Amino acid sequence: MNKFSQSRAKYKPKIINYLLTAEAPPMESSGRFFYYENMSKGDSLFLEIMKVLYFGDNPNLSYIRQNKNKILKQFQKDGFYLEDSVEFPIEGTSRQKIKQIKEQLPHLKNKINKLAKENTKIILISATVFKACYEELIKEGLKIINRESIAFPGSGGQKRFKKTFSALLKEHGFNIKLTH
């Protein structure tokens, strides 16, 4: 089990209510990862998801960073789990990334079938993941709840991410809990 898998497994809920499927882990040399507990910079996917779920429009980013372990435990308790479409970092243009993700679809389907139960809601995060996976996963009978791509919350996509992600969660029964 690699470092990414170990960090992710620590926060796997017993029952996954919402399976968030993102693109790929970052380069290991970056020192960044959604489930790494000690992050002082970057971490946009984690920060933006947690703002929507727990902190609203005016979050205390230093509080979030200092309490990442506690926040990840709440994320786990609420039945959220983040997986990547691809097990390894990918680079290139959007077209190249889509191709790489499609090549890994059999592995992703297998992983999702092991994780998702009948009531698990699956959310595809980023245009590349949506374009590469949506149709095939729907054909597989998986419960993908977004019918359009959700912008990755980096490089200017934060507002679109927040709007789409929060509306989707509300539509599918998650009561957003602002804690700070």
PLM features per residue range, with description:
Residues 1, 124, 159, 177-180:
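Intrinsically disordered, charged low-complexity linkers and terminal tails
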Residues 1-136, 140, 144:
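A polyanion-binding, active-site-adjacent surface
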Residues 50-58, 142-175:
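Short, flexible loop segments at boundaries between secondary-structure elements
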